[in-house]
UniProtKB/Swiss-Prot annotation:
Localization annotation: Cell membrane
Role description: May act as a membrane anchor for the tetrachloroethene reductive dehalogenase PceA.
Gene: pceB
Organism: Desulfitobacterium hafniense (Desulfitobacterium frappieri)
Keywords, comma-separated and alphabetical: Cell membrane, Membrane, Transmembrane, Transmembrane helix
GO CC terms: plasma membrane
Membrane spanning residue stretches: 3-23, 35-55, 66-86
Name used for this protein in its record: Probable tetrachloroethene reductive dehalogenase membrane anchor protein
UniProt record similarity statement: Belongs to the PceB family.
Membrane-protein topology: Multi-pass membrane protein
Length: 105
């Protein structure tokens, strides 16, 4: 392992931190930041970074088919919690039916 490999792994860690901070800010800005949404966003971030790390390590070992497999399995797995987090964060609140002041006949 040379210095470039170490720098790549450090960069992946920094990207993971920045993405997680972005997810936190996005949910905080929407006013919807409960723990389940944070965990779901973390899982999406984890699987995305894991897919990138898998791809890099497979590329450095010259296992080119493993790159595709990692992107399909782990990248596809990252889409599921990402979509759930996005849909729940943008889900409108239920409207409460207002009572009418006028009397209808």
């Amino acid at each position: 392992m040379n210095i470039y490999d170490v720098l790549i792994w450090m960069a992946l860690g920094m990207i993971a931190l920045l993405i997680q901070y972005g997810i936190w800010r996005y949910l905080k800005g929407k006013g919807k930041d409960p723990i389940p949404l944070q965990i779901c966003g973390f899982l999406a971030n984890f699987f995305f970074i894991f897919a990138l790390a898998w791809g890099y390590s497979s590329f450095s070992e010259r296992e080119y088919q493993a790159i595709g497999m990692g992107f399909i399995f782990f990248g596809g797995t990252a889409l599921i919690p990402a979509i759930i987090t996005y849909r729940l964060a943008n889900h409108p609140a239920k409207k409460i039916r207002e009572s009418s002041d006028s009397i209808s006949a």
